[in-house]
């Protein structure tokens, strides 16, 4: 069967593979389009295996929130270069992986198949990274923020007491701003009572020993350490942080103001923040 230019064009549109690869696939498969698609996929899988040892230090964090704000997911999709991370197909796949995490709780085999397909198309090693699912039972809403470069993504569970509040524009804007706060300020916990006690003890001991080394009197060392811990809370606890859009207001005060505006009692239950590469940095620090 003669392979025409229109057949090559059609296969390219379906697979985004190179023109010569498409022509060869059609020749190998007797001009049968579906078989040619599979042939290219198989070739892509072979390429993927060869590329599997290459580092995937670039990529994106995919973010998905359901229309009702009750279910959400984050998913890292890694690649080798920043150029590929900005490719439309790569960005689209990151979003689809996040949606699968939101609806199923984890990535399944179809996710790896999709990744292998895009490896064949774009010619770089890729892989999935961390994932996180968030669900809201009852009233409330999941706010989200995805940084413009796709390297930082946040989910935050906002609480309220009235079902109608979750549809209020003022409440939704507050949820978005709190998520943006988390992205920018990287808090360790929502509030002081949710900070890991071991972290608090470590901070207290660091400042206590520092005060002793500076020759401070023993009777004020504890006060110095406690003062330092309070300062630490203002930096590490979301509710105590200065609001990024008005540093004279804390996030807790923002919630109070918004609560009054919507006639409800608002709060933050939890959050998840992913920054691409931070897991690798943590592993290096632990070595």
Curated annotation (Swiss-Prot):
CDD domains: UBA_EF-Ts
GO MF term (any one): translation elongation factor activity
Compartment(s) where it occurs, according to its Swiss-Prot or TrEMBL record: Cytoplasm
Domain of life (superkingdom): Bacteria
Key word Protein biosynthesis present: yes
Alphabetically ordered keywords of this record: Cytoplasm, Elongation factor, Protein biosynthesis
Main location: cytoplasm
GO cellular component, as recorded: cytoplasm
Region (Involved in Mg(2+) ion dislocation from EF-Tu): 81-84
PROSITE patterns: EF_TS_1, EF_TS_2
Pfam family, one: EF_TS
Keyword presence, Cytoplasm: yes
InterPro entries associated with the record: EF-Ts_dimer_sf (IPR036402), Transl_elong_EFTs/EF1B (IPR001816), Transl_elong_EFTs/EF1B_dimer (IPR014039), Transl_elong_Ts_CS (IPR018101), UBA-like_sf (IPR009060)
Role, per record: Associates with the EF-Tu.GDP complex and induces the exchange of GDP to GTP. It remains bound to the aminoacyl-tRNA.EF-Tu.GTP complex up to the GTP hydrolysis stage on the ribosome.
Family per record: Belongs to the EF-Ts family.
NCBIfam families: tsf
Protein name: Elongation factor Ts
Native source species: Nitratidesulfovibrio vulgaris (strain ATCC 29579 / DSM 644 / CCUG 34227 / NCIMB 8303 / VKM B-1760 / Hildenborough) (Desulfovibrio vulgaris)
Gene: tsf
């Amino acid at each position: 069967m003669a392979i025409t230019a229109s057949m090559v064009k059609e296969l390219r549109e379906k697979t985004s593979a190179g023109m010569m690869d498409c022509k060869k696939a059609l020749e190998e498969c007797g001009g049968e389009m579906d078989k040619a698609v599979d042939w290219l996929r198989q070739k892509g899988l072979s390429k993927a295996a060869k590329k599997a040892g290459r580092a995937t230090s670039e990529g994106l964090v995919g973010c998905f929130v359901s229309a009702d704000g009750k279910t959400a997911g984050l998913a890292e999709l890694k690649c080798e270069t920043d150029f590929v991370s900005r490719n439309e197909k790569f960005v689209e796949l990151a979003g689809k992986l996040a949606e699968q995490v939101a609806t199923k709780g984890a990535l399944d085999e179809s996710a790896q198949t999709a990744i292998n397909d895009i490896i064949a198309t774009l010619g770089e090693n890729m892989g999935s990274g961390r994932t996180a699912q968030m669900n809201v039972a009852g009233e409330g809403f999941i706010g989200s923020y995805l940084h413009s470069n796709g390297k930082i993504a946040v989910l935050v569970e906002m609480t309220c007491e009235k079902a109608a509040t979750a549809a209020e524009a003022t409440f939704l804007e507050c949820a978005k701003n709190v998520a943006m706060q988390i992205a920018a300020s990287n808090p360790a916990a929502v509030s002081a009572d949710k900070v890991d006690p071991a972290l608090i003890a470590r901070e207290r001991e660091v400042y206590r020993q520092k005060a002793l080394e500076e020759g401070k009197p023993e009777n004020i060392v504890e006060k110095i350490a406690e003062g330092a811990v309070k300062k630490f809370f203002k930096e590490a606890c979301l509710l105590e942080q200065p609001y990024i859009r008005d540093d004279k207001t804390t996030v807790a005060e923002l919630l109070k103001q918004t609560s009054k505006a919507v006639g409800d009692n608002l709060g933050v239950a939890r959050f998840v923040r992913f920054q691409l590469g931070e897991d690798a940095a943590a592993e290096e620090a632990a070595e």
